Amino acid sequence: MGCERKALILMVVIWIMSFWTLSLADISSTEIAVYWGQREDGLLRDTCKTNNYKIVFISFLDKFGCEIRKPELELEGVCGPSVGNPCSFLESQIKECQRMGVKVFLALGGPKGTYSACSADYAKDLAEYLHTYFLSERREGPLGKVALDGIHFDIQKPVDELNWDNLLEELYQIKDVYQSTFLLSAAPGCLSPDEYLDNAIQTRHFDYIFVRFYNDRSCQYSTGNIQRIRNAWLSWTKSVYPRDKNLFLELPASQATAPGGGYIPPSALIGQVLPYLPDLQTRYAGIALWNRQADKETGYSTNIIRYLNATAMPFTSNLLKYPS
């Protein structure tokens, strides 16, 4: 009887260690994205030089629609109409980031601004504008003469017209016609389906989905409780078309940047959250941080990288008990 009990204990320990090894392998390739575009964020080139990020979202193109003559790029305190300083000086920094292997996306929408995809015809015009002035280097646009790596749909404002699927479809067709390599991504809220982007997501044209797991108590992390975020993640793995490693968790880099909650300390993210997310091995690609300023203040991305580079054994005891 004693030998059987010891054998059972050994089997359990082996299972736990194999689970831990697999989980660590799954998250060790974590890619980090960050939103950049405020005065306190520092220089774009310096953001890329940290080597912490694989993707930078220039945020935001947040003024466009049928009643707006020309789309406007507003980088708070950096450049744009409110500052009275054009953003074309960023051209050299964008290209420097790209030479370093950092993908630079243009983020549409955001929490402020005035924007809408007000009709199917306007969606087509906007797609052509984005391709001409941001994605092709064909003409000098608000960021200079650039070919950005992608367009990011960060739609957070209630509008009557929801033609985001039309805009996505037009961009996808442009990509096909010109044999372009630019990427398309979205940042829906953690509650699935997303009220603004669900139709667009169902087109299956997004390369990456960055799910916002904050400012929504129904599906975000709270201290010591991962059940809501786990359930939301599972819902997204089922509702989003299967594509290898195309789901990111978008998280606040500090408590202050998410007044509605959802902040996850780096140690808890690596030790208590990620290892318990379903389909991690096939669907998880990394995390996105809101925003660069907060990351500078807290060192969130640096801590994530430090934990990933370590053996992570300090967190083993946390894995022996499923968090509530």
From Swiss-Prot:
UniProt cross-references to CDD domains, sorted A to Z: GH18_hevamine_XipI_class_III (cd02877)
Keyword Isomerase part of the UniProt annotation: no
Residues carrying sugar: N309
GH18 domain sequence ranges: 30-311
Signal sequence extent: 1-25
Domain of life: Eukaryota
MF term (GO), any: chitinase activity
Keywords from the named record: Glycoprotein, Signal
BP term (GO), one: carbohydrate metabolic process
GO cellular component: extracellular region
Family of this protein: Belongs to the glycosyl hydrolase 18 family.
Function: May act as a carbohydrate-binding protein.
Protein name from the UniProt record: Concanavalin B
Organism: Canavalia ensiformis
Lineage start: Eukaryota, Viridiplantae, Streptophyta, Embryophyta, Tracheophyta
